[in-house]
Each structure stands twice: as C-alpha cells, then as structure tokens.
A protein has these predicted regions:
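Multi-pass alpha-helical transmembrane bundles in non-GPCR membrane proteins
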Residues: 1-215
Length: 215
C-alpha cells in the first residue's frame, strides 16, 4: 500500500497506523484460517497456490506497515521500495488461486505465467530502479490488476457467480481507492486510501475462500 509523500498531522498518522495494525492482525488470522480450511477439506494439493496468495497478502500488509509506521527510519528509502514492490506480489498472489484452482488447461498456465512474469519485472524494477517507472506506477498496478478481463469468459465458466462477483468487487474497491491515493490534500487521505485497500483485500479473501471451497 504505497503512501503519499506529503507530511501528515499526528492524528492522520494515528488513523493510518490503526488501519495498518488492523490489516496485519486480519492478514495473519486470515492466512492461517484459509490454510486450515484447505487442510480440513483434505485439499492439500491446493495448498501451494493458497500459500502463494497468503505470502503475497502478508508481504503487502507487512511492507506497507513498515514503510508507513517507521517514518524516521534510516532505511526509509528501502522500505518504500519494498512497499511498492510488494504491491506487484500481492496482485499476482491474489490471482494465483483463481488461475490455478479455477481455470483449467491453457488458460490456467498461460495467464498464471503472464501475470507472474509482469509482476516479477515490476518487483525487480521497484527494488533496483524504482524511479524508472515512478510516474506510471499506478497505471501499471491497475493494468496488472485488471489483466484478468482477457480471460473473462473462462473465469465466468469456471467460477461460482458469487465468487466472481467478489473478485470483481475487490478490483473495483482497489481502483476506487486510487482516487484517494492521488488526492494528496484531502485530510486523512492516506488512512482512507489504506482503508480501501484493506476493504478490497478482505473482499478478495472471501473470493479466495470461495474458489478453495469450489475446487
């Protein structure tokens, strides 16, 4: 969850800190719960994509919390790099249960490979040469986030309507939150943005649970 660059008032930082702490708590609890769900259903073969999803989610939440909560750290530049890189990992990780457990055949392999190839390039650039794509970062995140529309037909055929609706709703929440991410002068802008991210991640979590149950 990348942060804005302006200085925030103490009350704004407190609100943002609360959002991050809630996110970490929910993320850890949710990651454990979804693994337990898969194990309880004897779906051990489903664990790799679930673990990838959980790792991407926790990476985003953890890196965002570190960057936004430790604002005076001498490692701030690197915290920012990891914060931004983790967004690519989160997007690709979120797609993984749907592409590997939901889709079948060529679509499953091809879409997973493309998503992770783009994410890997984005992660590498954000860690090593972050300023190269700074001005188009938001566009790249949105493009990767909505890349699944190219497989709209296969997804509609493979996923339960409720799961599909949750997947789309999460994407809409993420995209809507970008407005507040860019609205730098709005009071509590950063906390609102991160609230949208947490809400979207929660909706996508419900969708992942759905695809695990369906698989």
């Amino acid at each position: 969850m990348a942060a804005g660059l302006r200085e925030f008032a103490a009350r704004e930082l407190a609100a943002d800190r609360a959002i991050h702490l809630l996110g970490i708590a929910l993320g850890i609890t949710g990651a454990i719960a979804i693994v337990v769900i898969a194990a309880a259903m004897r779906r051990l073969g489903d664990l790799p994509p679930i673990l990838i999803y959980a790792a991407g989610l926790l990476a985003m939440l953890g890196c965002s919390a570190a960057y936004n909560m430790f604002r005076t750290s001498r490692w701030r530049d690197w915290l920012r790099r990891f914060d931004h890189a983790a967004i690519f990992a989160m997007i690709a990780g979120t797609y993984t249960p749907f592409t590997l457990l939901g889709l079948k055949g060529t679509w499953s392999i091809a879409l997973t490979a493309v998503i992770w190839a783009v994410a890997a390039i984005g992660i590498a650039i954000k860690l090593l040469k972050p300023h190269r794509i700074e001005t188009i970062s938001v566009g790249l995140y949105l493009a990767l986030g909505w890349i699944g529309v190219v497989a709209a037909g296969p997804f509609m055929a493979a996923l339960d309507p409720v799961t599909l609706s949750l997947l789309a709703a999460g994407g809409i929440l993420y995209s809507s939150g970008v407005v507040f991410h860019l609205w730098r002068r709005l009071p509590y802008q950063n906390a609102i943005w991160h609230g949208f991210v947490l809400a979207a991640a929660s909706v996508h979590y419900a969708a992942v649970v759905g695809v695990v149950v369906e698989a």
